[in-house]
Regions:
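Alpha-helical cap/lid subdomain in secreted, periplasmic
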Residues: 18-34, 38, 43, 47-185
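Catalytic nucleophile-elbow at a beta strand-turn-alpha helix junction centered on a G-D-S/GDSL motif
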Residues: 1-15, 40-44
């Protein structure tokens, strides 16, 4: 099976993506996997929609696509409409290429999200991407909410997590939470 990872620098980093690849190999030991790493720093959903063909779909029929763009869509100042259109561009194009493709949307955390999450508010960019996930009935993993809750409970600090570009501990938290959703899916 072909598994692709489309996103920004957090996806490009050695970390959660590599951990998920290893987990999938253990989860499906008789499957020959091709992993497509399509993380490019500072790219959100609009650049992702434009590079989907060359960076992901040209590599073969994709069975599972992980997509994340919340941090960069927010950082790069894309409007709500641009955030929705960019993410929907990725999802629609991916599903046209393979209607049976599984797509999992991920929402990572960065500094400006924390005060909102601590007040029980969801960052607008996550709500905008969730509109797309809900419309297409896609599973999504709100890692921003998960990590903020764990920090509020005192499990670890932002510094211990590693910040926006997590250290290995932070990536392990991301991978463990994603794996819980994979447990439900497969």
């Amino acid at each position: 099976g072909t598994v692709a990872f489309l996103g920004g620098s957090i996806t490009e980093m050695k970390g959660w993506r590599d951990m998920i690849c290893e987990d999938l190999k253990q989860r499906f030991p008789y499957t020959k996997f091709t992993f497509v790493a399509a993380g490019i720093p500072s790219t959100g959903s609009t650049p992702g929609a434009f590079r989907l063909t060359d960076d992901v779909l040209s590599k073969g029929k994709v069975d599972l696509l992980f997509v994340e763009a919340a941090v960069n869509d927010d950082t790069n100042g894309f409007s709500a409409i641009e955030q929705i259109r960019g993410m929907e561009g990725i999802v629609r194009h991916a599903l046209v290429s393979n209607p049976s493709m599984d797509i999992m949307m991920l929402h990572f955390i960065y500094d400006p999200f924390i005060p909102k999450l601590d007040k029980g508010q969801m960052p607008d960019v996550i709500l905008n991407h969730e509109r797309v996930a809900n419309h297409y009935l896609l599973p999504s993993v709100n890692l921003a909410s998960e990590i903020a809750a764990r920090m509020r409970s005192g499990e670890f600090t932002w510094e211990q997590f590693g910040g926006t570009h997590p250290n290995l501990l932070g990536h392990a938290y991301y991978a463990a939470t994603i794996n819980k959703v994979l447990d439900e899916m497969y």
